[in-house]
């Protein structure tokens, strides 16, 4: 991750009914619960949950995690099921739904896709605010009758992925999935909006080689790394093979074949 001055944030309740929830989030995240004219981002607590808004005249709008409606719901219903490239990359096949550790969870979009296909997914996010957005989205998803069974297959851990993988206790994940931050070329409005949130808070993953090394040591069957299509491979061992899409590429590091369980 790049080293740079942390952006200024403050927590804001969007209604009087949300004041107590805002106070709890402010305390938990160690952020001020007051207006700050110098703040670059507002962490807003409203009836629809937690969201982060970049402040200023050119704000792209709030970012939140929503597994019930919007893009995640559309992809769940119409995204191509087990024929999706991410499904092929992690090894989803008839009768095979691998246990996946998504070690760079972000807003949980890829983890949700895998859980919707039947995989048990453990998500790890090291940036506390991004993890809070993800936790809030999962909590709301668990209250929706259609999405609750999917959310039940998702478990969230906060912390440094490389450290967690090195100290892993218990049954190892069959697949470790990595999507390190990289100067993305995806021009979609949604991705650009999210990147404007992520970059100041998270930066690029300069420790991607260490992540890959820890993932290869932990995964029992394979490691999958998502990259922009023309990006170089992560420094370290070469992948066994790759799957290429229009804008993304999945580098697969196989260790042994996935079997029906």
Swiss-Prot record:
GO terms for molecular function: 16S rRNA (guanine(1516)-N(2))-methyltransferase activity. It catalyses: guanosine(1516) in 16S rRNA + S-adenosyl-L-methionine = N(2)-methylguanosine(1516) in 16S rRNA + S-adenosyl-L-homocysteine + H(+). One of its GO terms (cellular component) is cytoplasm. Pfam families: SAM_MT. InterPro entries: 16SrRNA_methylTrfase_J (IPR007536), SAM-dependent_MTases_sf (IPR029063). S-adenosyl-L-methionine binds at residues 109-110, 125-126, 179. Its EC number is 2.1.1.242. It comes from the Bacteria. SUPFAM superfamilies: S-adenosyl-L-methionine-dependent methyltransferases. Its main location: cytoplasm. It is found in: Cytoplasm. GO terms for biological process: rRNA base methylation. Keywords: Cytoplasm, Methyltransferase, rRNA processing, S-adenosyl-L-methionine, Transferase. It is an enzyme of class 2 (transferase). Belongs to the methyltransferase superfamily. RsmJ family. Specifically methylates the guanosine in position 1516 of 16S rRNA. This is Ribosomal RNA small subunit methyltransferase J. It comes from Pseudomonas aeruginosa (strain ATCC 15692 / DSM 22644 / CIP 104116 / JCM 14847 / LMG 12228 / 1C / PRS 101 / PAO1). The lineage of its organism: Bacteria, Pseudomonadati, Pseudomonadota, Gammaproteobacteria, Pseudomonadales.
């Amino acid at each position: 991750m790049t080293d740079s001055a942390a952006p200024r944030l403050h927590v804001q309740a969007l209604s009087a009914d949300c004041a107590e929830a805002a106070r709890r989030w402010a305390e938990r995240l160690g952020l001020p619960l007051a207006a700050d004219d110098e703040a670059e981002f507002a962490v807003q607590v409203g009836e629809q949950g937690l969201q982060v808004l970049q402040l200023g005249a050119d704000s792209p709008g709030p970012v939140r995690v929503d597994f019930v409606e919007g893009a995640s719901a559309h992809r769940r219903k119409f995204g191509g099921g087990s024929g999706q490239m991410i499904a092929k990359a992690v090894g989803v096949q008839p009768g095979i739904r691998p246990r996946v550790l998504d070690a760079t969870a972000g807003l949980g979009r890829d983890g949700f896709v895998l859980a919707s296909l039947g995989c048990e997914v453990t998500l790890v996010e090291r940036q506390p605010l991004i993890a809070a957005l993800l936790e809030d989205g999962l909590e709301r998803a668990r209250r929706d009758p259609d999405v609750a069974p999917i959310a039940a297959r998702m478990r969230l851990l906060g912390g440094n992925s490389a450290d967690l993988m090195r100290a892993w206790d218990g049954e190892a994940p069959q697949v470790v999935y990595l999507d390190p931050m990289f100067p993305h070329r995806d021009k979609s409005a949604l991705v650009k909006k999210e990147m404007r949130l992520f970059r100041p808070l998270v930066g690029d993953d300069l420790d991607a080689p260490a992540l890959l090394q820890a993932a290869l040591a932990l995964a029992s069957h394979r490691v999958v790394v998502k990259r922009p299509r023309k990006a170089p491979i992560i420094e370290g061992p070469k992948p066994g093979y790759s799957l290429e899409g229009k804008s993304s590429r999945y580098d697969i590091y196989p260790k042994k074949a996935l079997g029906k369980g």
